[in-house]
């Protein structure tokens, strides 16, 4: 049986099922997992969603780490990425709502959490590592 199309309500229910508690209005809910604040932001009108976790203030990040983040986005992440917005480094997963599956939503959540937790160490969204040429542990 085919999975029904994703909706904002269904997406938020699946998100809620993964955590102990959520707060915030529909379209902008948040939770805390392992001391990491994770947000599910959705815009059904434009068929877009994103899962975000605040990682660091960019002003407090060694400028050399920005290059490490870009390399990690290529070699050590799957579908989630490091991103910078308004002076903040985030881990982020973006997807159209209508084609999002339950498994992709859960995987995106897990990857965002892993990137946030692995910032400063492996910079990886999971155990996958294609290896950064010329990069040692940072």
Feature roles, as predicted:
Residues 124-138:
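Short, highly charged C-terminal tails/helix-capping segments
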Residues 50-88, 92:
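Short, internal acidic amphipathic alpha-helical interface segments
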Residues 81-117:
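A short, solvent-exposed beta-edge/loop patch
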Residues 40-52:
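Short, well-structured hydrophobic secondary-structure segments
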Residues 1-37, 77, 81, 138:
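Charge-rich, low-complexity N-terminal segments
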Residues 74, 113-120, 124:
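Short amphipathic alpha-helical signal-transduction/dimerization elements
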Residues 46-48, 57-58, 97-99:
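Short, surface-exposed beta-strand-loop junctions and turns on beta-sheet-rich folds
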């Amino acid at each position: 049986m085919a999975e029904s199309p994703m909706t904002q309500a269904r997406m938020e229910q699946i998100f809620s099922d993964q955590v102990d508690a959520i707060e915030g209005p529909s379209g902008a809910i948040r939770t805390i997992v392992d001391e990491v604040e994770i947000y599910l932001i959705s815009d059904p009108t434009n068929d877009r969603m994103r899962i975000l976790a605040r990682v660091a203030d960019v002003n407090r990040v060694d400028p050399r780490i920005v290059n490490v983040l870009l390399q990690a986005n290529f070699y050590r992440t799957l579908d989630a990425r490091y991103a910078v917005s308004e002076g903040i480094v985030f881990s982020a997963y973006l997807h159209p709502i209508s084609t999002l599956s339950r498994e992709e939503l859960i995987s995106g959540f897990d990857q965002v959490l892993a990137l946030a937790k692995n910032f400063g160490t492996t910079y990886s969204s999971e155990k996958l590592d294609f290896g950064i040429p010329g990069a040692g542990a940072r």
